[in-house]
Amino acid sequence: MKSITRRQLLKSAPAVIGALSVAELAAAQAVSPADSGKGPKVGLVTYMLAAEWDVPTIIANCTETKFAAVELRTTHAHGVEVSLSQVQRAEVRKKFEDSPVKLASLGSAFEYDSPDPAVLKQNIEGTKEYARLAADLGCDGIKVRPNNLQEKQGITKQQTITQIADSLTIVGRAAAGEGVEVRVEVHGGGTNRFPVYSAIMEQCQSPNVYVCWNCNDSDLEDGGLEHNFKLVADKIHFVHMRDLFVEEYPWRKLFELLAGTGYEGYCCAEIPASSDPLRVMKYYRALFLAYQNRL
């Protein structure tokens, strides 16, 4: 075996050190920003792309496309409803807990604007029952919505704002006892405008009621995106997103605003059905990351 002199060793040392530095740098760069765990995480609302999928299909497709979470919208083919028995609820919970896909939300259509006291009570009690379902499934939040102002019925805007806020206080307190958040989607005729929506949130007396940002055109009105975002920024706990190819919506600015609050929750795609859903989901995730410079 040929021996190496001290002089030869010293001469080659810088190259060895340099090679190690390059290797270490490459290793450090091997974890891409997309997989770092920092920043918002992409998810899916079953409305409407996954409306016809059962739970195993939802989990399989989200896993393949690297979607981190799902919101199960009520009435869809997954069948996750309050009618499930305790055994069935445990089975659904285990399916998600044994997968990389988080059951992040249950999407309801409960609303609190009706001038009919019986309808209002039905929605409040239904929300409480839905929160119990979420708790049984290991899901930490449910989506509800305002829906409409009732001025055509002779009811003032302020009366409806107060009624919705009071109802949210009731359901928020009830859901807190289940360990489940109530997330109010920015939605509805007039109630999706931020002077109205932010007033509802301000009047609600439950700290367990949060904002589900919904990426509406109305976000850009009444002072614009940044102004409206700041009105509710500290309460945003969930985000619904539509098609990211919609150029009229300032996606990069929204991601900047979310980053400014330290938001690392879920942004769930609420997009139309497709004959090639997995391809759509892969492109969606790529755009989602590209807008944040995380690719």
What are the functions of these language-model segments?
Residues K2-G43, A50-T65, T191-L295:
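Histidine-acidic metal/acid-base catalytic patches
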Residues A13-S21, Q29-A34, P56-I59, T63, ...:
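Active-site acidic/histidine proton-transfer and metal-coordination neighborhood
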Residues T46, T74, F110, P146, ...:
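Residues that line or immediately flank small-molecule/substrate-binding pockets and catalytic motifs
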Residues A68, D140, H237:
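Receiver (REC) domain switch/active-site residues of two-component response regulators
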Residues E71, S105-G107, K143, H240, ...:
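Conserved beta-strand positions in the central sheet of alpha/beta enzyme cores
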Residues R73-R93, N147-K152:
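Glycine-rich, proline-tolerant flexible connector loops at the mouths of alpha/beta enzymes
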Residues E81-S85, D116-V119, G154-T156, P195-Y197, ...:
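Short secondary-structure transition/capping segments
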